[in-house]
Amino acid sequence: MRSKLLFQQKMAALLALLLVLFCTLVRAQTVLSSSLHSEKKYKARMVKRPIKVDGKLKEHDWKQAVLISDFEDIEGASKPKPAFSTNVKMMWDSQYLYIGAVLEEPHLWGTLKKYDDIIYRDHDFEVFIDPMGDGEQYFEIEINVLGTIMDLFMNKPYKKGGTFDLGWNTTGILSKVIANGTINDNSDIDSGWTVEIAIPFKAISRTQRAATPSLLNPWRINFSRVQWTLEPDGKSYRKKLNQNNKPIAEHNWVWNPTGVIDMHLPTKWGYLYFKN
């Protein structure tokens, strides 16, 4: 009788422990899921007046636009918060999607000057757009502090066997970068840089029809900022090397985390709603 009672007590204790472990795992999974799949949303206002793409973002419409300021590490909230702020706004009219970004940056640095250079080898700002919102075909635009652009089209994500088309160009794109400091000069501390981009709707389409905004159906969109660890190099900068004599891995700071170091997961991007 006594041995049976002891057995029952041990089983009860074991079940209680398993219940605690289960609840802990569920809670952790919930937190992780909410941090990685928050599906952030943005409502872009339609503007009636022409916007001058000058990099200043001084128009009244820009001041009225909703601010994105909650960039995170691409892997999610479990990683350290970005060291520098990144603020983004969006607007639209009948022809363009306007994107304005202000990037805090104490060391303005850029080396790539040729169109379609691999811009993420510098500090950069990146835009990913899926106009259909289906997680398939999408477009990528990157720009550095020198105003150099790289753009490409993906027929589908890499994990689905997709390939990139670097020959695709964002025909008619308007862009301007303003450096608030001195580029490639380590003798001072800079404030940052401002990016203003106008993306023609007719450019981000693989058909004769423009990617027309819908007030009902959102697009998928995400923003990324690639940030390298630098060290002085004469009067300029260079990437700091690790113990294996290779550049220290870059930081990837994004609007909507994908959970892994991979931006090419459009189903994990945020939503862009067009507001009239």
Would you name each region that the model predicts?
Residues M1-S34:
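Bacterial Sec-dependent N-terminal signal peptides
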Residues Q29-N276:
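Structural preference for beta-rich elements and adjacent junctions enriched in aromatics
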